[in-house]
């Protein structure tokens, strides 16, 4: 009779956590932060069609890192849940927190019940009437949910990027200042010998939840509008600029048509 090997529940959970963290850390980072005019999303993404940032509902955005097919399924489920609630009750009843809680329950169930956990980390962000009313929720592979006031970072070496944001963030930043702070954080890792690197516009996916708009407020920043936000030289990225305003695309995104990038090492 063959001997049955025993693995403790604690060891199983540790192995699953290590597996998920290792694969998430290989991906490119995403930064989300509140600023005077709304909520800004900045992600490293070489794809122009597979999105890591998207809209969930009128005033709610979604960002993710990790395995594309997994967080895309989560995004689609969130859009359906928000649409159903808005149709059954009122569009104003659709808030970021219930969506984040639903994601937490789903991720937690998958982590404990399935053989393989989801290799994802996601953000659900809701824009309020003022920066103090913004909601930023970060959800991890095991269903943990954290309320992150002001800013958050997802992906590998998040601690270092968070320290950069902590030093420079304040709610009075305009769009240009907020973008350059996010760019400074993203540029602070990945260079040779631990130095900063240059991150070009072609490597970025950028969007905002515009506080001043009515209805659907999610807008992507593309082409010339994104180029206008970029610093003229790499040195300009060291200090956020609070003097510019930036522009954004007037075309609303379509929640049912957006996806994300499969993370690359």
UniProtKB/Swiss-Prot annotation:
Ranges for region Disordered: 228-265
HAMAP family, per database record: Proteasome_A_B
Pathways involved: Protein degradation; proteasomal Pup-dependent pathway
CDD domains in the record: proteasome_protease_HslV (cd01906)
UniProt cross-references to Pfam families, sorted A to Z: Proteasome
Keyword annotations: Cytoplasm, Proteasome
Lineage, highest ranks first: Bacteria, Bacillati, Actinomycetota, Actinomycetes, Glycomycetales
Quaternary structure, from the entry: The 20S proteasome core is composed of 14 alpha and 14 beta subunits that assemble into four stacked heptameric rings, resulting in a barrel-shaped structure. The two inner rings, each composed of seven catalytic beta subunits, are sandwiched by two outer rings, each composed of seven alpha subunits. The catalytic chamber with the active sites is on the inside of the barrel. Has a gated structure, the ends of the cylinder being occluded by the N-termini of the alpha-subunits. Is capped by the proteasome-associated ATPase, ARC.
Coiled coil: none
Biological process terms in GO annotation: modification-dependent protein catabolic process; proteasomal protein catabolic process
GO-annotated cellular components: cytoplasm; proteasome core complex, alpha-subunit complex
Disulfide-bonded cysteines: none
Family of the protein in this entry: Belongs to the peptidase T1A family.
Notes on activation and inhibition: The formation of the proteasomal ATPase ARC-20S proteasome complex, likely via the docking of the C-termini of ARC into the intersubunit pockets in the alpha-rings, may trigger opening of the gate for substrate entry. Interconversion between the open-gate and close-gate conformations leads to a dynamic regulation of the 20S proteasome proteolysis activity.
Role: Component of the proteasome core, a large protease complex with broad specificity involved in protein degradation.
Biased composition (Basic and acidic residues): 248-265
Cellular compartment(s): Cytoplasm
Protein name (record): Proteasome subunit alpha
Chain segments annotated as transmembrane: none
Record-level Gene Ontology MF annotations: threonine-type endopeptidase activity
